[in-house]
C-alpha cells in the first residue's frame, strides 16, 4: 500500500532502522516490490546480515534501476562493494567499484568518480593481505584482561586499557566500541613498525579528514593472536596543545573492525575481562536492540525515554555519556527544565570544539525495559559540524560500568546487561 511505502521510505531517508524493522515485519507484504527490496537491503545491512544484504542490493539494482534513480544506484553499488569487503572478499569489492567507476567516467562529476577510485584502491590494498588471520584449530573463545585508567592526570573519568603485543612490542590499547576502525598515531605506527600503504579512508570526528591504512603483522591481546591487522593512521593532536594533553589516551585504539570478527563478546566488569568468542550465542531476544550505521559500522543501541525511543552510539571510548542535539530537539522542555546551561569542550579527531550545552544532574532511561540512571549528563543544544555531538549522542563508559556484565551479540544484534 502507499501508506506502508511512505512509512518505510521515511525510515530509510531518516536512517530509522529499528522503526523500519517493525514496519517491515508488520507490513512488508503490502509494500511495493521496490520499497520492499530497498527496505530488505537496508535492514540486512543495519542488522549485520551481510550475505543477505549483498543478495538484496543486487536484486534491488537489477530490477529497479530506473525507479530508484542514478544517485541511489551509485550509493547502493558502493554499499554492495563495502558489503563484499565485510564478507572478506576484497577482490569482489574492488571489481564492483572499478566497474561502477568505469561506467561513470566522463558522465558523472569528477569528485564522485575519484571517490569510487579511492575505494577501489582501498579494497585492492586490503585484498593483498589475508586480514585477521587466526591459528586454525585454536580456542573458540579468548580472554582479554583490561584495566580502567584515568582519562588524564586531573580526571576522575576512566577509559578501558588493554595490554597488547603489537609486532612483538608491548603496547597499551584503548578499547573503543565507538571507533569504526583500529587507530594508531603516526609516531606509534613507526615505533611498532606497521607496514604503511597508500590506501586511505575517510574519518569523521570534530571534523572530516582522511587516514592512511597500515598493516600490523601480528597483534596479541590476552590469549588471542591475530595476523595482518589493519589500522588507520591518524594524527590526533594535529598541533593542538589541549588535544595533545589527552591524545595519548587514544594513540592506539582497538575498534569495531576487530570486534566485528567475533559473533559475540562479553565485557565483565567484576573480573575486568573481555571475552571474545567465535561461538554463536543463543539469545532470548527475538528483536534486535542494536544496529549498525550502513557506512561506518558503529553500533547504536535503542533507548526508551519520555514515551519514545531513539538510537544512540555505544561508545566505550568515551569516558562519559553525552547527548546530542537531536535529543535536545526532541526533549527541549525536559532539558530546559532540569538542565543548567554551560559551555563544554569535546575532543576528538580534528581537534577541540566548544558546544553550548545543558547539564542534567541525573537522567533515567531504559534499555529493553531495563531502567538505568546516569548522573551529570551534558546535552548539546546547538547543531554543529562536530560529529561527536550530532544525532542523539553516545553512551559512554559510565553507562557500561553500571553493570556487572555487558554482552554484545554481533550475530543477533543484541546488547544484554546484568
Q: What are the functions of these language-model segments?
A:
Residues 1-418:
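Pepsin/retropepsin-fold aspartyl endopeptidases
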Amino acid at each position: 500500500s502507499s501508506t506502508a511505502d511512505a512509512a518505510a521510505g521515511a525510515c530509510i531517508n531518516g536512517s530509522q532502522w529499528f522503526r523500519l524493522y517493525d514496519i517491515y515485519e508488520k507490513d512488508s507484504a503490502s509494500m511495493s516490490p521496490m520499497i520492499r527490496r530497498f527496505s530488505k537491503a537496508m535492514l540486512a545491512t543495519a542488522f549485520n546480515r551481510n550475505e543477505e544484504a549483498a543478495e538484496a542490493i543486487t536484486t534491488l539494482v537489477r530490477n529497479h534501476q530506473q525507479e530508484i534513480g542514478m544517485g541511489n544506484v551509485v550509493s547502493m553499488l558502493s554499499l554492495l562493494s563495502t558489503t563484499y569487503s565485510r564478507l572478506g572478499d576484497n577482490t569482489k569489492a574492488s571489481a564492483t567499484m572499478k566497474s561502477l567507476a568505469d561506467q561513470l567516467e566522463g558522465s558523472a562529476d569528477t569528485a564522485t568518480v575519484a571517490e569510487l577510485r579511492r575505494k577501489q584502491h582501498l579494497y585492492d590494498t586490503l585484498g593483498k593481505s589475508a586480514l585477521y588471520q587466526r591459528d586454525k584449530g585454536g580456542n573458540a573463545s579468548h580472554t582479554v584482561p583490561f584495566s580502567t585508567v584515568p582519562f588524564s592526570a586531573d580526571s576522575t573519568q576512566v577509559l578501558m586499557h588493554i595490554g597488547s603485543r603489537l609486532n612483538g612490542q608491548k603496547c597499551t590499547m584503548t578499547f573503543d566500541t565507538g571507533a569504526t576502525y583500529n587507530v594508531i598515531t603516526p609516531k606509534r605506527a613507526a615505533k611498532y613498525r606497521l607496514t604503511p600503504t597508500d590506501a586511505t579512508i575517510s574519518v569523521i570526528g570534530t571534523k572530516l579528514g582522511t587516514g592512511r591504512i597500515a598493516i600490523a603483522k601480528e597483534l596479541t591481546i590476552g590469549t588471542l593472536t591475530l595476523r595482518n591487522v589493519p589500522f588507520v593512521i591518524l594524527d590526533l593532536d594535529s598541533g593542538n596543545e589541549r588535544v595533545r594533553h589527552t591524545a595519548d589516551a587514544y594513540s592506539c585504539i582497538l575498534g569495531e573492525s576487530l570486534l566485528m570478527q567475533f559473533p559475540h563478546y562479553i565485557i565483565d566488569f567484576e573480573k575486568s575481562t573481555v571475552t571474545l568468542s567465535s561461538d554463536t550465542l543463543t539469545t532470548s531476544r527475538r528483536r534486535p536492540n542494536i544496529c549498525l550505521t550502513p557506512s561506518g559500522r558503529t553500533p547504536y543501541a535503542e533507548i526508551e525515554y519520555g514515551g519514545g525511543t531513539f538510537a544512540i552510539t555505544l561508545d566505550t571510548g568515551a569516558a562519559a555519556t553525552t547527548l546530542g542535539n537531536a535529543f535536545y530537539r526532541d526533549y527541549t522542555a525536559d532539558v530546559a527544565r532540569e538542565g543548567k546551561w554551560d559551555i563544554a569542550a569535546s575532543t576528538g579527531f580534528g581537534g577541540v570544539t566548544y558546544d553550548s550545552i545543558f547539564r542534567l544532574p541525573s537522567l533515567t532511561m531504559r534499555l529493553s525495559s531495563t531502567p538505568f540512571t546516569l548522573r551529570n549528563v551534558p546535552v548539546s543544544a546547538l547543531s554543529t559540524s562536530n560529529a561527536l555531538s550530532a544525532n542523539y549522542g553516545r553512551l559512554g563508559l559510565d553507562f557500561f560500568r553500571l553493570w556487572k556484565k555487558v554482552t554484545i551479540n554481533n550475530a543477533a544484534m543484541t546488547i544484554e546487561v546484568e
